[in-house]
Curated annotation (Swiss-Prot):
Key words of the record: Coiled coil, mRNA processing, mRNA splicing, Nucleus, Spliceosome
Region Required for RNA-binding, residue ranges: 51-143
A GO cellular component entry from the record: nucleoplasm
Segments of skewed composition (Basic residues): 126-143
MF annotations from Gene Ontology: double-stranded RNA binding; protein kinase binding; protein kinase inhibitor activity
Taxonomy, superkingdom: Eukaryota
Gene expressing this chain: PRKRIP1
PANTHER family given in the database record: PRKR-INTERACTING PROTEIN 1
Coiled-coil ranges (or none): 91-152
Protein name: PRKR-interacting protein 1
Free-text function comment from the UniProt entry: Required for pre-mRNA splicing as component of the spliceosome. Binds double-stranded RNA. Inhibits EIF2AK2 kinase activity.
UniProt organism field: Homo sapiens (Human)
Subunit structure: Component of the pre-catalytic and post-catalytic spliceosome complexes. Interacts with EIF2AK2.
Region (Interaction with EIF2AK2): 1-50
Length: 184
């Protein structure tokens, strides 16, 4: 057997570094502390709690043996049984009414969402069409200007060309002026 003195000699356990006690003053600090603790050991799996299932009443009993009424004899234990069954049934009906109301509200919300989406798409299409029209107008004016420069030719005097181009650009400027200004 080994001597008791030899078995009690162990290397000392590594000591944990002391952690400072930090009391979070607000939700942001609390979140920061939780993140720091998670990031100390990134290999460790993070426990993600599952969504709690919504409360639902027990389904009604498939078979009720003794159907008793509220007029059970005074002092009998039957009244309590009736009362509990009635309470559960009312609870179940209230739950079904609440779920029907919730489904109705969800359906209305989805309809409103779809309606808003369609309206937004129509507005976007209208604006896109307007932008495209303005762009085409600018391109057309640019082409007209280039054609006029080509038609003038190098042989004509610059004074006449500049006056005719000034007249042409004046009409073009009137055409180019948009009915609205963007970004104001």
């Amino acid at each position: 057997m080994a001597s008791p003195a030899a078995s009690s000699v162990r290397p000392p356990r590594p000591k944990k570094e002391p952690q400072t006690l930090v009391i979070p003053k607000n939700a942001a600090e609390e979140q920061k502390l939780k993140l720091e603790r998670l990031m100390k050991n990134p290999d460790k799996a993070v426990p993600i709690p599952e969504k709690m299932s919504e409360w639902a009443p027990r389904p009604p009993p498939e078979f009720v043996r003794d159907v008793m009424g509220s007029s059970a004899g005074a002092g009998s234990g039957e009244f309590h049984v009736y009362r509990h069954l009635r309470r559960r049934e009312y609870q179940r009906q209230d739950y079904m009414d609440a779920m029907a109301e919730k489904q109705k509200l969800d359906a209305e919300f989805q309809k409103r969402l779809e309606k808003n989406k369609i309206a937004a798409e129509e507005q976007t299409a209208k604006r896109r069409k307007k932008r495209q029209k303005l762009k085409e107008k600018k391109l057309l004016a640019k082409k007209m200007k280039l054609e006029q420069k080509k038609q003038e030719g190098p042989g004509q005097p610059k004074e006449q060309g500049s006056s005719s181009s000034a007249e042409a650009s004046g009409t073009e400027e009137e055409e180019e002026v948009p009915s609205f200004t963007m970004g104001r």
